[in-house]
Amino acid sequence: MGKDTIADIITSIRNADMNRKGTVRIGSTNITESIVKILLREGFIENVRKHRENNQYFLILTLRHRRNKKESYKTILNLKRISRPGLRIYSNSQRIPRILGGIGIVILSTSRGIMTDREARLKRVGGEILCYIW
């Protein structure tokens, strides 16, 4: 049985957000780094640091905060894994779904790398739908 690294990072971020943790530590691979870059660029996370411990690299993510009058609280971050090792989901560029009318993003793995739904539509490429984030 294989390990699903994308589901692991989605679960880690979701659990940290629900437990009101400020930071998340995930293992660093090429796939996780490209997904984290997209999350940082789209504003879902605040900061990313690369940390080395015992010849292993980790990414330390700082989650974004919202301010309230009484106290600061975390944003409610919704992440959902779509394509998984047992059931791969593919889409062409015309049929890439829109999440909440364009408010959320879809992360795709294409022949040109991992990108958001907007970038894939502009480049007119389809691919495997990895996850939804809203």
Swiss-Prot record:
Localization per Swiss-Prot or TrEMBL: Plastid, Chloroplast
Pfam families: Ribosomal_S8
Gene Ontology BP, a term: translation
Signal peptide: none
GO cellular component: chloroplast; ribonucleoprotein complex; ribosome
Family membership: Belongs to the universal ribosomal protein uS8 family.
Subunit and interaction comment: Part of the 30S ribosomal subunit.
Record-linked HAMAP family: Ribosomal_uS8_B (MF_01302_B)
Physiological role: One of the primary rRNA binding proteins, it binds directly to 16S rRNA central domain where it helps coordinate assembly of the platform of the 30S subunit.
Name of the featured protein: Small ribosomal subunit protein uS8c
Organism: Aethionema cordifolium (Lebanon stonecress)
Gene: rps8
